[in-house]
UniProtKB/Swiss-Prot annotation:
This is Iron-sulfur cluster assembly SufBD family protein SAR0880. NCBIfam families: sufB. Belongs to the iron-sulfur cluster assembly SufBD family. InterPro entries: Fe-S_cluster_assembly_SufBD, SUF_FeS_clus_asmbl_SufB, SUF_FeS_clus_asmbl_SufBD_core, SUF_FeS_clus_asmbl_SufBD_sf, SufBD_N. GO terms for biological process: iron-sulfur cluster assembly. It holds the Pfam family SUFBD_core.
Length: 465
């Protein structure tokens, strides 16, 4: 029976369920735990070797000395693997009842029926439900949970796995590489264009839980795909860790849009590595919504490797009481005539802290490259703070770089104008915030835009967490 979490008001994601897992590893990170995960999944020897090497790297690498405070993150107090069911089901009726009730509340079956080409639902460490329209399979599209792709498409999987984000990239990429479980694997063949999105939903249910999904997307030459992920967790008094890795390969003339709407509870550390390689005339779009969490550190990255490659990041971050949103983007121009755009919208309230942290790099071969950066922050009270930390590296003098940053508060004139028309101060402030984030929400499919606006309203009311 679902339990109501404390102090979540109308926040529909704040509930948690009784433990329904069929296997749960001991807390703490050891070689035995890593071997146990690999053994439970019946993985090939090369993957176990990869995991063990990654674990050694994790032990050797220092914690980041920049960004948010990670001093309270205790790796020995985390459960690294929870298996909720025997297998990923293709029929919703076959999903275990407790888990099904959770996703029913979150609207996953309804969403699939209405407007999705395929959907995947991950609960704790494993995907429990996965389905895709039959005609997409007939076109050669692969959309599977990552564990199944390793077993069923090993040659393709091995070719691309860890090619964009190696284990040595950073400490949390090494951690993910050692204990990864679940995530999505997508391959879209040459010249195949998906008109409707694929979606994955990630849910942490347990206390002191670590979720470490690994997502790998390959858009072959001339292909296009839109992938949407949603993330939530219940409210607990102790911390959980979400540390995902996302790798995307955008081949010549291909197009990928990756949309994230995360709404973690305020006890979750969200430490994610997302990167894409974009080849000739390819186009990569990150649309990134960051709400909730205790601390988010996330900087979607485009490495523009082919002439004419394009990359863009459109992000929103909302930090409330006790929250730090340290987010931004990285654009690495390695080829001529590449272009990138970063638009960052940040809101802080009730003492929350938002940080834009970005890197734009122009390599020696990036002749004719151009980048445009726009950072806007809206601070809603005197206790909240905002920082903008851009870092630009230029090794070619034939490039164009524009950067605009703006920090503002809700003006008395705006409030007076709206209130003089019979609107309350609370409603007026909400309207101003909604107008501020409109460039983000207009890029979402309608159903997601409605949900995003609702989540922002909850944040404005202080009812999340």
């Amino acid at each position: 029976m679902a339990k109501k979490a404390p102090d979540v008001g109308d926040y529909k994601y704040g509930f948690h369920d009784d433990d329904v897992s069929i296997f749960r590893s001991e807390r703490g990170l050891t070689e035995n735990i890593v071997r146990e995960i690999s053994n439970m999944k019946n993985e090939p020897e090369w993957m176990l070797d990869f995991r063990l090497k990654s674990l050694k790297l994790f032990y050797k690498m220092p914690m980041p000395q920049w960004g948010g405070d990670l001093s309270e993150l205790n790796f020995d107090d985390i459960t690294y693997y929870v298996k909720p069911s025997e297998q990923a089901e293709r029929s919703w009726d076959e999903v275990p009842e407790e888990i099904k009730r959770t996703f029913d509340k979150l609207g996953i079956p309804e969403a699939e029926q209405k407007y999705l080409a395929g959907v995947s639902a991950q609960y704790e460490s494993e995907v429990v439900y996965h389905n895709m329209e039959k005609e997409l399979e007939e076109k050669g599209i692969i959309f599977k949970d990552t564990d199944s792709a390793l077993q069923e498409n090993e040659e393709l999987f091995k070719k691309y796995f860890a090619s964009v984000v190696p284990a040595a990239d950073n400490k949390f990429a090494a951690l993910n590489s050692a204990v990864w479980s679940g995530g999505s694997f997508i391959y879209v063949p040459k010249n195949i264009k998906l008109d409707t999105p694929l979606q994955a939903y990630f849910r942490i249910n347990s206390e002191n839980m670590g979720q470490f999904e690994r997502t790998l997307i390959i858009a072959d030459e001339g292909a296009s795909v839109h992938y949407i992920e949603g993330c939530t967790a219940p409210v607990y008094t102790t911390s959980s860790l979400h540390s995902a890795v996302v790798e995307i390969i955008v081949h010549k003339d291909a197009h990928v849009r990756y949309t994230t709407i995360q709404n973690w509870a305020n006890n979750v550390y969200n430490l994610v590595t997302k990167r894409t390689f974009v080849y000739e005339n390819g186009n990569m779009e990150w649309v990134d919504g960051n709400l909730g969490s205790k601390l988010t550190m996330k900087y979607p990255n485009c490495v523009l490797l082919g002439e004419g490659a394009k990359g863009s990041t459109l992000s929103i971050a909302f930090a409330g009481k006790g929250q730090v949103q340290d987010a931004g983007a990285k654009m690495i121009h390695k080829a001529p005539n590449t272009s990138s755009t970063i638009v960052s919208k940040s809101i802080s309230k009730n003492g929350g802290k938002v940080i834009y942290r970005g890197i734009v790099h122009f390599g020696r071969k990036a002749k004719g490259a151009r980048s445009n950066i726009e950072c806007d922050t809206l601070i809603l009270d005197n206790e909240s703070t905002s920082d903008t930390i851009p870092y630009n590296e230029v090794f070619n003098d034939q490039i164009s770089l524009e950067h605009e940053a703006k920090v503002s508060k809700v003006s008395e004139e705006q409030l007076f104008y709206l209130m003089s028309r019979g609107i309350s101060e609370e409603e007026a402030t909400e309207m101003i915030v909604m107008g501020f984030i409109e460039p983000f929400t207009k890029e979402l499919p309608m159903e997601y835009a409605v949900e995003m606006n609702r989540l922002i309203k909850f944040e404005m009311e202080g009812s999340i967490g």
